[in-house]
Amino acid sequence: MSKKKKWLIGGAICAGVLVLAGIGAGGFYFFTHMNQVAVSSEPYAESVAVYMGGDSESGQTFSGKVEPEKQQKVYIDSEKGSIKKTYVKEGDQVKKGDKLFEYEGEDHSDEVEQANLQIEMTNLQINRLQKSITETEKKLKVAGKEEKNQLQDELDQTNFDLKTSQLELKQHQKELAGLTKNKGSNVITSKHDGIVQSVNQDIADGATGDQAAGPYIQIVSTGKYLVKSQINELLMDTIKKGSKVRVTLKTGGEGEWKGKVTSIGKLPAGAGEGEESESFADEEMNPQSSNYPFTILLDSHKGLEVGYHVNIEVMSDNADADTIKLPSDMVIQDDGEPYVWKADENHKAVKQPVEIGETDENDMVEIKSGLTPEDYVIYPDPAVKEGKQVTVNADTE
């Protein structure tokens, strides 16, 4: 039954004429409200909210896993030596730049001293060669023809030696910089704010095999949460970037969270370099087609924890979700000024001026201003008068 017919039935009821408009959903609506108004001549008021769009499910559901927006996995570099000290434990809150742990590191003091000596000696050599070049150039200006040839050969050799020494200097400086950098990199710090999710002490203690697999420390951000999932290529047209979703726990419960799709992978799951492909066992995966990862950013995550497995319901797009539309015959024109009847706080009929927009193919007219979703509107049958007591739909009040 259309919204317009619903109002016609309501008006007929209020006039005391009981008309059976149909069966099924229409008959159910009629008998549900008949007892409320059949004994009264009061007009009937319905909530404006029922004439708004809102979310509805598209029928597509997926499985996913809650993940932090940012996470840092720190692996041990065996070339830097053993762990000297760990500064954090599981559950600690850290800020960007905080120390996580420190390597014992190798003692490079002898190498640093040797590099500094080589740099100093090379600089002395460069200075000597530059002075020799200056003196030779002066002699060339006053030398005879035979002497000039000899001095030119000396000058060419000295210039060659100078360039060689300058290259040696750059090499020694590079070696020193490398030694200094390695010394500073012994301390590993956090890349962002977050919580230490785990510290694998077995790795620090020198464990091997399966116990040594994985990161030494994992940090998860405390900001926004994501949901990671996959979609089969045959269903790619059912979601897009910006699609709204509803998330619920697989374990059940009343909690639900809203979010939207922020990215859809251009490569199949697991095809990216270093990318792990997670299997969603309860999804119907077509072996003859590929699955693509997509990510959801949640509006809030209170009650969710990283690692939770969830259900994802894609909401259908609805451009009229926040638009109020009423049956066109509910809008009355008074000398070109449109108005509707609505119930005031005392459940009495009052005229409400409105600004109207276009009328759609279903004969529903857009109400641009004058009404809110909290208002209750009345079908304009002959019984409606200014100040008339009305019956408000208790189901939507």
Swiss-Prot record:
Entry keywords, A to Z: Cell membrane, Coiled coil, Membrane, Transmembrane, Transmembrane helix
Annotated gene: yvrP
Gene3D superfamilies: 2.40.30.170, 2.40.420.20, 2.40.50.100
SUPFAM superfamilies: HlyD-like secretion proteins
InterPro entries xrefs: CusB_D23, UPF0194_transport
Family: Belongs to the membrane fusion protein (MFP) (TC 8.A.1) family.
TM regions (residue ranges): 8-28
One Gene Ontology term, aspect cellular component: plasma membrane
Species of the source: Bacillus subtilis (strain 168)
Name of this protein: Putative efflux system protein YvrP
UniProt subcellular location: Cell membrane
Coiled-coil parts of chain: 106-183
Pfam families reported in the protein's UniProt record: HlyD_D23 (PF16576)
Membrane topology: Single-pass membrane protein
